[in-house]
Amino acid sequence: MAGSLSEIKAKINSTEKTSKITSAMRMVSSAKLVKSEQSARDFQIYASKIRQITTDLLKAELTSGSTNPMLVSRPVKKTGYIVITSDKGLVGGYNSKILKSVMEMIEEYHADGSYSIISIGSVGSDFFKARGMNVSFELRGLADQPSFEEVGKIISQSVAMYQNEIFDELYVCYNHHVNSLTSQVRVQQMLPISDLVAEEANDEGVVGFELEPDRDTILNQLLPQFTESLIYGAIIDAKTAEHAAGMTAMQTATDNAKNVINDLTIQYNRARQAAITQEITEIVAGANALE
């Protein structure tokens, strides 16, 4: 019985240590989430302005029958997917949701291999490579608060692959942050841009601009920058969802540890009570034997 009591006590101590670790990790994820949410809000100020300028310029461009390759849809022979996952685990179902969605799309639409994956995050890279899938580029070890300089190269490579007709449309697949408890899988088209902003560009109220040197030159510079800003925004959004998932997972782990501790404590008290009762019974029996 003594051995049983010591084993239960050891389990309680071990679970309490685990609970302290998961609680600390939850607090770290919570702090990261607050920073990511602020970064997302700050970025939206820039994103909304460049989207407004681009849309206003495209209103005239689309109606004039533009031939800009980033605006014009072409026959789709190959599709590019930027897939954003985490670099580490302990984030609940964050990675499994997006990877399942991507696999379903590829199995349904690209059984012939007419796709290319640009992977951001070690979990996704390892997942796709283990299955021998087409990974053109990868980025591992992304910071908790990624700067544009950190992700700029892989973003510009993705846009360049579309411009060079390595693939004919580009999507970004990621978890969109809704709140601290919820995220949604998003598969958002980035290129061609015409499909992305056509509805906005067809609205009335064109803003007049005096353009220097000319519209085409400006669009040739602006459209890649606009697309890159959309992709960067998706990365920030995905990171925010990752931190929220990590916080939720660690909170769940902490709660589960507390439940285990409560169950073990009850088990320990019952075993201790049984041991005391048995000891008293043995003492009484011994005393009776001496009479």
UniProtKB/Swiss-Prot annotation:
UniProt entry keywords in alphabetical sequence: ATP synthesis, Cell membrane, CF(1), Hydrogen ion transport, Ion transport, Membrane, Transport
Highest rank taxon of the organism: Bacteria
Compartments where found: Cell membrane
Major subcellular location class: membrane
BP GO annotations: proton motive force-driven plasma membrane ATP synthesis
Coiled-coil stretches: none
UniProt membrane topology term: Peripheral membrane protein
GO MF, one example: ATP binding
GO annotations of cellular component type: plasma membrane; proton-transporting ATP synthase complex
Oligomer status and interactors: F-type ATPases have 2 components, CF(1) - the catalytic core - and CF(0) - the membrane proton channel. CF(1) has five subunits: alpha(3), beta(3), gamma(1), delta(1), epsilon(1). CF(0) has three main subunits: a, b and c.
Recorded family membership: Belongs to the ATPase gamma chain family.
Main function: Produces ATP from ADP in the presence of a proton gradient across the membrane. The gamma chain is believed to be important in regulating ATPase activity and the flow of protons through the CF(0) complex.
Entries under NCBIfam families matching the protein: ATPsyn_F1gamma, PRK05621.2-1
Record's protein name: ATP synthase gamma chain
Natural source organism: Streptococcus uberis (strain ATCC BAA-854 / 0140J)
Gene: atpG
